[in-house]
Amino acid sequence: VTGGASGMGLATVERLARDGFSVAMVDRDRALAEREAQRLQAMGLAVQAHVLDLTDEAAVRALVDQLSPVQVLVNNAGIFDERKFDVVSSADFRRAYEVNLIAAATLTQAVSQQMPDGGRIVNIASRAYLGARNHPHYVASKAALVGYTRASAMELAPRGILVNAIAPGLIDTPILRALTPERLAAQLALQPTGKAGQPEDIAQAVSFFASAQTGFITGQVLFVDGGKSLGGSGA
């Protein structure tokens, strides 16, 4: 699980460990990853922390060699920042694609080459890929990740490796808590459910895709967004 030391990633690590998996928590923050891994280990869960810069392809492939074979890959790590449409730069686009798409593609390629037939890959996209204001580089990178999900699902289906994506909406993470009260209220007003989701909601969806009961589902996007994708203006 990449980006596994906080937020949705941490909830996913704990959920998969409770499902019986031995989980590699991959994160760039050594102190945080080691602290959270120790906390989960104290609960009797099989979790190991691994520090990795996902933009370092050689390091990515070295870690995959160390961990292989991997039964389930969760590409959760990503970056988000706001840029107005008329000021977003080519550097902003490159950085978003480097982390939100290319890192996931590199890891998927490396893992799938050694993954047992019947493995599972889950990509964490975003409801924003449908279109949203004030972060066009992020929207584009997540839309690209959805496209890559479908392409890799077709490539890997003959081996029984299933690839799906989850598109979270408003989830209670540090990014959401950083919003001003007015901005948060405006966002929640657009939610049919009137509330934000929890990281555990995403972890539950990952657990579903990682399970043996999903043997005929691949190339799909599951929206976990409190109904936001049903309509309304993007934010």
Model-predicted segments: where are they?
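Canonical Rossmann dinucleotide-binding motif of NAD(H)/NADP(H)-dependent dehydrogenases/reductases
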Residues: 1-24
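Substrate-binding pocket helix/loop in short-chain dehydrogenase/reductase
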Residues: 84-85, 92-94, 187
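Active-site loop-to-helix junction immediately N-terminal to the catalytic Tyr of the SDR YXXXK motif
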Residues: 88, 127, 132-140, 151, ...
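Alpha-helical segment proximal to the catalytic Tyr-Lys
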Residues: 113, 154-158, 215
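A conserved structural motif in NAD(P)-dependent oxidoreductases
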Residues: 191-202, 213
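Short C-terminal tail/terminal secondary-structure segment
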Residues: 207, 218-235
